[in-house]
């Protein structure tokens, strides 16, 4: 099976949708220049319910016209012409978009869901699309469209993942096969966000404190251990050593909180870290011999004895 769409529909024409449109419509892109004598030229169409509602909506329409993209503020029968639909609305509107598009889809059309949603929300979107005869593909965007445009890295999951990724990579995207289980790409992004947005919040708290103390440059230059082993391995090492050193680190965070308050910074994230470490201390899992466990062993101990929720 291979993909050869003639019409692509974009649901949502904000930062993501318009960036994808620019890539598809660029010189040398998927749409390319009209070919002489071609009775069925490749086309990009779009739907954005904010079209012409305000200054932003007016700008969306202007950009669509510049690119030669036929855009509408409503879900209309024009969607039935699309062989490939790319949904790039905000996560809270993903199901609404899927349900609005589903009755209009061409049978067998691929529906690429780029929305930031949970795995369960992805399942709801998928059921709406598949009930209408569409082929649902779960995609997690792992970078920003603002800097990367259509080349923002993506993880792709779904029953037709191989041909979809092959088509995407041949037409300007940067896509990677994750697997055949829809929802898994969305779940990867959600869990990754715990780290990335957490680091963002910590960075705000730490760097504001450092700047107020006049030591920002020095703090930024003392991250050599992270640079040396890479971020993912660094986080893994922290998890392993957390089993052994949670008590010492908990006490240290109490002093860190005091430092921030003395600097006039509310230790919001610091306080959460202190409570998180105290939770491990209270579980009493530190090994008597002080031996650092493997990552698998550490995760099992934390999951079974420290972190509740099920």
Mark where each language-model region is:
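NAD(P)+-binding Rossmann beta1-loop-alpha1 motif at the extreme N-terminus of oxidoreductases
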Residues: 1-80, 108
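The conserved SAM/SAH-binding core of class I Rossmann-like methyltransferase domains
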Residues: 11, 47, 87-88, 139
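Rossmann-fold NAD(P) dinucleotide-binding segment
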Residues: 75-135
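Rossmann-fold dinucleotide-binding core
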Residues: 117-197
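Helical "substrate-binding/catalytic lid" subdomain
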Residues: 188-291
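Short, basic/aromatic-enriched C-terminal tail that caps enzymatic domains
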Residues: 290-310
């Amino acid at each position: 099976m291979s993909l050869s769409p003639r019409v692509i529909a974009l649901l949502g024409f904000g930062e993501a949708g318009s960036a994808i449109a620019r890539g598809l419509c660029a010189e040398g892109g998927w749409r390319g220049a009209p070919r002489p004598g071609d009775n069925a030229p490749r086309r990009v169409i779009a739907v954005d319910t904010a079209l012409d509602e305000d200054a932003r909506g007016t700008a969306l329409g202007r950009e669509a016209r510049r690119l030669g993209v036929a855009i509408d503020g409503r879900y209309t029968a024009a969607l039935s012409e699309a062989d490939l639909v790319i949904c790039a609305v905000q996560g809270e509107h993903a199901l609404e978009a899927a349900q609005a598009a589903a009755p209009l889809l061409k049978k067998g059309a691929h529906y690429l869901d780029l929305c930031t949603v949970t795995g369960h929300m992805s399942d709801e979107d998928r059921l709406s699309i598949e009930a209408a005869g569409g082929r649902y593909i779960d995609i997690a965007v792992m970078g920003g469209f603002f800097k990367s445009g259509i080349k923002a890295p993506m993880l792709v999951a779904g029953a037709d993942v191989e041909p979809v990724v092959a088509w995407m990579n041949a037409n300007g995207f940067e896509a990677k096969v994750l697997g055949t289980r829809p929802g898994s790409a969305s779940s990867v992004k959600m869990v990754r966000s715990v780290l990335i947005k957490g680091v963002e919040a910590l960075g705000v708290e730490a760097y504001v404190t450092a700047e107020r103390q006049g030591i920002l440059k020095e703090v930024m230059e003392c991250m050599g251990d992270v640079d040396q082993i890479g971020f993912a391995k660094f986080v893994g090492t922290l998890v392993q050593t957390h089993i052994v050193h949670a008590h010492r680190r908990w006490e240290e965070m109490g002093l860190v909180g005091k430092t921030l308050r003395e600097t006039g910074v509310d230790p919001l994230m610091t306080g959460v870290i202190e409570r998180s470490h105290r939770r491990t201390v209270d579980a009493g899992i530190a090994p008597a011999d002080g031996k650092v466990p493997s990552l698998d062993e550490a995760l099992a101990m934390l999951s079974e004895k420290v972190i509740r929720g099920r």
